[in-house]
């Protein structure tokens, strides 16, 4: 066996009600004045209030930055950093989907004043220490709570990544109560995103290893086995917890055995057409699976055994299973369905 390295979060708290322990958790981390980073949608649906109340039970003062947008820009990061500095916060709590958690990661590093945002772009460019960091996902998709990566929008159609183990949080809190009632289209897109993470980690040509393989397979089993249930019964706590855990396991897998062609093709769609990341992944997945089939057949057939039956024969049966899931979820099944123009300029490719 070839040697490998595996990094992940050292402290995971999983289960219904775990977010009610945030005050105690902050005390354990030495956080007295945290900043909660989230988005307006979570404020509107009332998810912020119980989290803030829980945090307040163990802290002197709690501040909130709730202006995170999808595909957060550099200006959003700078605004969040300003809020942190104004509040003299000594810790950061990211609450939400990947966008909120990514912003939380970045400002926890920038808060020390040792580096500017452009200094961080790239791989292993973070040299600064960071503030204590807690991440709490409210969707079962990105796995950002356990990945050493943040993605920031740098222009009208461009993004830049930051990859460093210093972005891994001190603690990730997985509370399925915070995902109950998530809109079905969001559950569908984020769930498929997480499944793509698992598939691409398992079939990755780079850094694939026994730990990432084990996590990816367990992740796909959980995600594929509960995706339809959360769409038909959005308040099923057990199904929500399975999806949340599956997304986290997939995140741990692809954080160490990186994603590939599906994501490479999906990123430009998000950048140029502002398409949700989970949807762009769903659109690219079937074509990439078929393209890779000649060299990934054995791996795909292994993964096919983890899917709920019925699954048709061979690799084509594996691909069709995902096509049917995407269709049943009511998501667009082609670029034209998603309003992407047939003629795409060379600059967009």
Show where each model-derived region lies:
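Short glycine/serine/threonine-rich phosphate/pyrophosphate-binding segments
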Residues: 19-22, 44-47, 74-75, 99-106, ...
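Gly/Pro-rich interdomain helix-loop hinge
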Residues: 269-343
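ATP/NTP phosphate-donor binding region
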Residues: 1-91, 316, 335-336
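Glycine-rich phosphate/pyrophosphate-binding beta-alpha loops
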Residues: 141, 248-281
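Glycine/threonine-rich beta-strand-loop-alpha-helix active-site module
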Residues: 75-176
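Carboxylate- and glycine-rich phosphate/diphosphate-binding segment that chelates Mg2+/Mn2+
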Residues: 149-257
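Conserved small/polar residues in nucleotide/adenosyl-binding loops
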Residues: 347-349
């Amino acid at each position: 066996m070839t040697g490998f390295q595996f990094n992940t979060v050292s402290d995971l708290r999983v289960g219904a009600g775990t977010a009610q322990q945030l005050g105690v958790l902050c005390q354990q981390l030495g956080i007295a004045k945290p900043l909660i980073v989230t988005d307006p949608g979570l404020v509107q649906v009332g998810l912020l209030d119980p989290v803030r109340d829980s945090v307040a039970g163990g802290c002197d003062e709690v501040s909130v930055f709730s202006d995170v947008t999808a595909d957060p820009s550099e200006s959003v990061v700078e605004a969040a950093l300003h809020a942190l500095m104004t509040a003299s916060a000594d810790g950061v709590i990211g609450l939400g989907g990947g966008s909120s958690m990514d912003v939380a990661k970045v400002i926890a590093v920038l808060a020390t004043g040792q580096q500017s945002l452009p200094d961080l772009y790239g791989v292993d460019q973070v040299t600064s220490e960071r503030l204590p960091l807690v991440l709490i996902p409210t969707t079962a998709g990105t796995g950002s709570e356990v990945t050493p990566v943040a993605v920031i929008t740098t222009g009208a159609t461009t993004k830049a990544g930051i990859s460093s183990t210093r972005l891994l949080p001190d603690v990730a809190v997985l509370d399925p109560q915070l995902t109950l009632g998530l809109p079905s289209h969001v559950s569908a897109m984020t769930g498929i995103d997480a499944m793509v993470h698992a598939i691409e980690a398992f079939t990755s040509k780079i850094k694939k290893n026994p730990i990432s393989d084990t996590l990816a397979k367990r992740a796909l089993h959980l995600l594929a086995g509960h995706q339809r249930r959360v769409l038909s019964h959005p308040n099923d706590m057990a199904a929500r917890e399975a999806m949340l855990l599956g997304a986290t396991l997939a995140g741990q897998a692809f954080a160490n055995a990186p994603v590939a062609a599906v994501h490479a093709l999906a990123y430009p769609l998000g950048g140029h057409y502002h398409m949700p990341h989970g949807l762009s992944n769903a659109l690219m997945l079937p074509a990439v699976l078929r393209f890779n089939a000649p060299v990934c057949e054995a791996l795909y057939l292994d993964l096919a055994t983890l899917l709920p039956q019925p699954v048709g024969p061979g690799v084509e049966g594996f691909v069709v299973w995902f096509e049917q899931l995407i269709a049943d979820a009511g998501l667009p099944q082609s670029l034209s369905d998603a309003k992407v123009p047939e003629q795409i300029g060379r600059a967009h490719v």
